[in-house]
Amino acid sequence: MGYEEAFFRWAFLIATVYVAYYFLVSSDKKLATKPQKSKLTKLGKQKQRQKQKNTKKDTLVNRETPSKKSQKLETSDALKSKSKDSSKKEPVVVPKKGTPKIFQENHKVKKVKSPKKEKLVGKNPAEKEDTTDVEDTQKLEQKHSTTPSSLKMKSSISLAAITADDSLHNSFSSNDIDDGFQTVTSSRSYGKKKSTEPLTKRQRQNQQKKLRAKEMQELADEEQRRRLAAHRKELHEANRPRGGLNNSSRSAYSYINNGQAGSSKGNRYDSLW
């Protein structure tokens, strides 16, 4: 009886363990499969919502497009009409010299633009348009000028020569003009032209400072010259030739010239000792 009881007990334990293991494994499988299904369902629902939103937007756009197209057409027609109106230019009426004033008042006279100025305006938009009458400059010069062409050429050459000479004589350094001093307008041919405006307090102070600095520089230059002159004098006295054969200031060449250091008769070092 002891063996049978032991066998039944072991069989019961093994069966309970197997049943517990089976239930645990099945529950784990269910937990693993459930979130995947929920995720898939959520993604499907989100896609459906996006599709519904897109369809609503498409319907709204399709409803609004004809009105927008009509607005675009209206704006394009208005622009075309404006461009046509601007392209139509009124004819320019230029009165002759003998026309009366009544004609000029009735017919508005427009001033013709010069072609040269129009080109300049096109290059630089900041410049204003010039509405002066078109007149040939060469013809005006021929009318008003009484000097012949030969004299004109000579005068231009002489002016060029004068300016070249003046630039050599009247050349000024950058130190002559300063921001804090009196304003000076310099030109190549006529030198300097001082302005008639009175000096301010700051300009006067700067001018006084410059004058003081100039005086101090002159004093320093004079002192330097004196020192250099004294130094030159000392050097001259030191290098002056002195009498006597046994003088320490004499050079070796003086002995050779006298025939003492370089002579073969006497002892070479007698005069030195």
Swiss-Prot record:
Residues 145-154, 245-266 have a biased composition (Polar residues). The keyword Coiled coil does not apply. Residues 92-101 have a biased composition (Low complexity). Residues 55-91, 115-144, 213-240 have a biased composition (Basic and acidic residues). It is found in: Cytoplasm; Membrane. Residues 36-54, 201-212 have a biased composition (Basic residues). The keyword Membrane applies. It is a single-pass membrane protein. Keywords: Cytoplasm, Membrane, Transmembrane, Transmembrane helix. The chain crosses the membrane at residues 7-25. GO terms for cellular component: cytoplasm; membrane. Residues 34-154, 168-273 are annotated as: Disordered. This is Uncharacterized protein C13E7.07.
